[in-house]
Structures are given as C-alpha cells and as structure tokens.
Amino acid sequence: MADAGDNQQEAERRSDETESRSIKEPKEKEDEDENPQDQIQSKERMRQSSPYPVRPGKKDCQFYLKNGLCRYRSSCRFNHPTQRPQELPVRICKHIMDRNVAEPMYQDWRESESERRFDERTQRTFGDERTQRRYGIEYSGARPEKRSKIVPDFQMRDPRHHDTEWRFERERMERIERQRREAEENLQEQRQRDSIERQRREAEENLQEQRQRDSIERQRREAQENLQQQRQRDSIERQRREAQENLQQQRLQDMPENHNVDDQQNLQEQRRISIEKERTEARLRLEQIRPTVSFPINEFIRAVVLLRELIENWDDKAWKK
C-alpha cells in the first residue's frame, strides 16, 4: 500500500512539471515573437498605470522631475509626466571662460543654491501639515471639518539628496577652512610688516641719537681746543708784558737820582692804566667765550677761576712795583 501511494505522488508531481513547462514555453515564444514596438507600448502602458497621476495642463511636479519620486503619489495635484527630462536646459554664461569672473559668480550661485536648498528643507519639515490640509480640502470634496485625513505613502529617502547635502556641507567646511587660513596668512603678513616698520624706525632713531652724540662730542672738543689756544695766547701775552715792564723798571733804576718825582708819578699812572686795560680785555674775552662755546660747566668754572687768579696776580705785581 505504501509503494502504491508513493508511485501515485510521483506521477502527480511529474504531471505538474509537464503542465508548467507546457505553459511557460508558449509564453516565452510569445515574448520572442513580440517586436520592439510592442515592448515599448507595453512599457508605456505599465508607466501609465504608475501611482503618480498624469494631469495635462497642470504644472509639473518639481519633486518628481528632480528625484523621480513624489511623496503625495496619487493625491498630488501637479502633473507627473511619463518621461522625465534627462538634462534640464541651462543657459551658458558668456563669461564662463573668464576665470576671474566665473569663480566669483560660481561662489555667489553656490551660496544662493545652498540657501535655497535650506529653505526647501525647512519648508518640507515645517510645512507638511499645512500642505496636507490644503490637499485634503481640494480633493476630499467636503468641508474642512469633515474632510478625510490623507496620510502620505511611505517616504523613501533619496540617496542623491543625502549626497548633495553632504557635498554642500563639505564645501561649506572647506570654504570656512580656506577663509581661516587666509586670515592667518594675512595676520602673519601684517605682523611681519609691523616688525619691519618698527625695526626701520628704531634704526632711524638710533642714527639720529648717534648723530646728536657725535655733534655734542665735536663741540666739546672744539671748545677745549679753543680754551687751550686762548690760554696759550694769554700766557704769551703776559710774558711779553712782563718783559716790557721789567725792561722799563730796569731803565728807571738805571736813571740818575736827580730825576724829578713827576716822572715817577707818570710812570705809575701808566702802569695803572695798562693794568685796567688788561683787566678789561680779559673780561671781554671771557664774555665772548661764554655764549659761543658749549662745554661742560666744570670746564667753564675752571676757566673763570684761572682768569680771576691771573687778574689778581697782575694787580699784586703792579702794586708791588
């Protein structure tokens, strides 16, 4: 009995396989016999049976044109064309070949595009409820308080949108990093320029100070030389006058005793006049040296003391004679 049951099951299995093979072979033959035009028409019929509605005369759905998906599917009130354009028509700027013009324009466009995408993401995030409410009012055919709630189909995340966001975020970070590097380079250049300018000013100040010191030192040496020369001239003049006075005194001593007293008085008067004259000349010479020569105060005091001692010595010698 068991063998009979097994044989019956095996026969049924073989008959099923034969039947399925006979069904598949005509289908394959039919597919092979179909021409490419029939295949295109069949695909067109399948595309027309898509959940995205085709609404002639309406504005095309931008989300569908961009991503090939629409979150509202059959409830969307925009048109969903059966054939999406592969490339959108874009006008080429005439300045695109000029690098100096094209790069700033591209930067501005990229920033505006980033802001636009951010606004779209914000609108999608915060405007879904209002949009669903508007769609429900238009297609429910009822009042707002009695309209049916429309829940959108499952939202598939487009990987291209994620890649676009990641690319814009990377470009933004690169732009920030580039701006930071440029700011650091500008700061370093400014510091270098400030350092060079400071060194130049310090060099000029040092040069001016050195020139002033050299000028003061030169004036001091000239004053010392002038003072020494004046001392030498005064010494020679004093020796000459002393020699003349000694000669006159010797002559007076050699004169006979019968000379009258008037001659001696005249001689003393002449000596007094000569002493006063020498004193006046020494005072004038001192006044001339004082404003013209710039030398330390110690040297000036020493010169005054020497002149005073010289005048006093002349007075003593004159009165002794």
From Swiss-Prot:
ZnF (C3H1-type) residues: 55-83
GO molecular function: DNA binding; mRNA binding; zinc ion binding
Alphabetized SUPFAM superfamilies for the sequence: CCCH zinc finger
Skewed-composition ranges (Basic and acidic residues): 10-29, 181-224, 231-244
Stored InterPro entries: Plant_ZF_CCCH (IPR050974), Znf_CCCH (IPR000571), Znf_CCCH_sf (IPR036855)
Keyword presence, Translocase: no
Keyword Zinc-finger tagged: yes
Keywords: Coiled coil, DNA-binding, Metal-binding, Zinc, Zinc-finger
Regions annotated as coiled coil: 164-290
Region feature (Disordered): 1-59, 181-269
UniProt name for this protein: Putative zinc finger CCCH domain-containing protein 9
Organism annotation: Arabidopsis thaliana (Mouse-ear cress)
